[in-house]
Amino acid sequence: MEPKTKKQRSLYIPYAGPVLLEFPLLNKGSAFSMEERRNFNLLGLLPEVVETIEEQAERAWIQYQGFKTEIDKHIYLRNIQDTNETLFYRLVNNHLDEMMPVIYTPTVGAACERFSEIYRRSRGVFISYQNRHNMDDILQNVPNHNIKVIVVTDGERILGLGDQGIGGMGIPIGKLSLYTACGGISPAYTLPVVLDVGTNNQQLLNDPLYMGWRNPRITDDEYYEFVDEFIQAVKQRWPDVLLQFEDFAQKNAMPLLNRYRNEICSFNDDIQGTAAVTVGTLIAASRAAGGQLSEKKIVFLGAGSAGCGIAEMIISQTQREGLSEEAARQKVFMVDRFGLLTDKMPNLLPFQTKLVQKRENLSDWDTDSDVLSLLDVVRNVKPDILIGVSGQTGLFTEEIIREMHKHCPRPIVMPLSNPTSRVEATPQDIIAWTEGNALVATGSPFNPVVWKDKIYPIAQCNNAFIFPGIGLGVIASGASRITDEMLMSASETLAQYSPLVLNGEGMVLPELKDIQKVSRAIAFAVGKMAQQQGVAVKTSAEALQQAIDDNFWQAEYRDYRRTSI
């Protein structure tokens, strides 16, 4: 259902003159009416012509096209965001296909690497370990009292780029931009946070422009105590907030999620969001092929927290489709840099232990090696689905893809690593190596592939199809927790919007132009499941839909009325 157009109430504003123009959430620039210019002491501070937001957006689009590099376009858009947020979101929504890769992956990776160099204006909250005893004061300095979504990172595992220190702040800023652009969550309700616990990136420590705490990262008890102080301070200031953990290192991501997911409404997008969008994609791809996900054999390259999170959600989905847990686990094979995970492998991480294959069941495999490589696994398993979350480029070789295709007429290949430079194989190569038969979904955006005069659209398995809808659903329903069932409902809803399933052709995932519609549908499904799970107050379907409508922010100016502080 599309959001209803409703008359916005006037806002009563105590600020005036140049001060008002400095508020990105309130600034309208040349769109202030003549009456507003008189009432707010703006006469003479703006050019004479009063413009509409569409006229402003057209000028901004022309200016944007004048920039030649993606990083310069990113800097330009961030400048608009820090000047006039309403215009920023109107512009982005007008050109989402073009601009999403610029405000988020892959360009945000370069923006994180160059954060201190391209820094213009502060956005969000920087909490350094040096200021840990001022945590409550720091959060009290945030002027917005009604924060509903926080995205927090410690900058240690930024995309596939590793430790970027406080440069990781680019990720929460970008993620929250998508919460608004795709999920309709008002920017006034969002807060990006970076926990500055030092950096082990020597290049940053030696950089005279680096703006973070110049110290090796704190670890162990010091680290977890610091994060806990942050969580407790957040609960004190905004007890009902949704907290998203973002780009934490593998060694910390799962422990933090497990520790806090039942203490505060929280989730980890790298683990749970990636899993949800991947499972939604696989459900749709399986249906398009006339089957179910439970019928497929799946091989992963990459057995970190993200890969294992996806695998566990796939297992949950195939159990929902009728498999026993044992049968579901026997269909999933995890390969990391040491080979296939088996019960004889030492030094497994806690979240890997349930995803091993029993070595005794592999005695008839065609291999002489003790270390079972990806090629060994593909040759013996004969998988239907190959998923890459390794963060290493080129590991899906021609030999591996052709071996897979030899036994699977319509292979599903998903090189999900970000950014583009880390992808396991390009869609162009995968399509060519499978004679045009592979169904490909990637983690980063790729242009359609042309092979033998046929055009193959490439779906981006983008978490933006999932997390904005989850956020909107949590806010609209008032959910106190995010359960696994809520995530599964998001995956199922995403699959229902697949053009390939609905029309028998096109991409396996919806087009970006439909992302707000998809987010609203996911919000409803998530909110309804929250009610069924007992983590939100039960209401009628009509009341939940109305709450979604009421919370869906649109990039439109509102009339201002003057008031005193």
Swiss-Prot record:
Transmembrane regions: none
Molecular function via GO: identical protein binding; malate dehydrogenase (decarboxylating) (NAD+) activity; malic enzyme activity; metal ion binding; NAD binding; oxaloacetate decarboxylase activity
Coiled-coil ranges per UniProt: none
Active site residues according to the UniProt entry: Y104, K175
Activity response to pH changes: Optimum pH is 7.2 to 7.5 for L-malate.
Record-listed E.C. numbers: 1.1.1.38
Superkingdom, natural source: Bacteria
Gene Ontology terms: cellular component: cytosol
Binding residue positions for a divalent metal cation: E246, D247, D270
Catalytic activities: (S)-malate + NAD(+) = pyruvate + CO2 + NADH; oxaloacetate + H(+) = pyruvate + CO2
Note from the entry: Can also use NADP(+) but is more effective with NAD(+).
Family named by the database record: Belongs to the malic enzymes family.
Protein's name according to its UniProt entry: NAD-dependent malic enzyme
Gene name tied to this protein: maeA
